[in-house]
Amino acid sequence: MIKITSKLYIHFLTIITAVICIFSHHAAVFAISYGVMLLHEAAHLAAATAIGLRIDRIAFYPYGVNLKLKNRFVHNLADEIILCLAGPLVNCAAALISLSLYNVYRTPYLQLFYVDNTALFIFNMLPVCPLDGGILTKRLLSYFFGGKKAALVMKIISALIAAAMVTLCVYMVYVTEFNFSVLLLT
């Protein structure tokens, strides 16, 4: 990890990815994709700050952006819901706004912004830890059924979703051309 400031870090592979994107004429795709991920994490940061949590660092990885908090423990369910939903809801709102704008200004950049926000919203709402949907689902299950039952249910849900993704990957390899990005998700 390369330390940019006391709270900002960039993985060296992220820089290599950016350089490859620039030289292969995909700089806009890289910028929009990382912009969408940064928007998501900025929403979590705003929510965390609003409920009294402090930031440790923001790190840019080749696969995304990560916000790490100093004091992750959230005392009540309402604050946990706010923290977990902030990022996905901002992505959902950005997707709806960009879709509306795309209906007027048909640019590939607006289309990509819409697709990236929609994909990040859907992916992050999957009930699998450490995704936002998984953290929220586990916290809700813990609230109603206790920690042990919640952990067991989350293991089952995670296994089912992983099996579904592997099945989808096998199906796509069998029926269509090989899609390495789907394989990476599994």
Stretch-by-stretch model annotation:
Residues 1-186:
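Hydrophobic transmembrane alpha-helices and their immediate loop junctions
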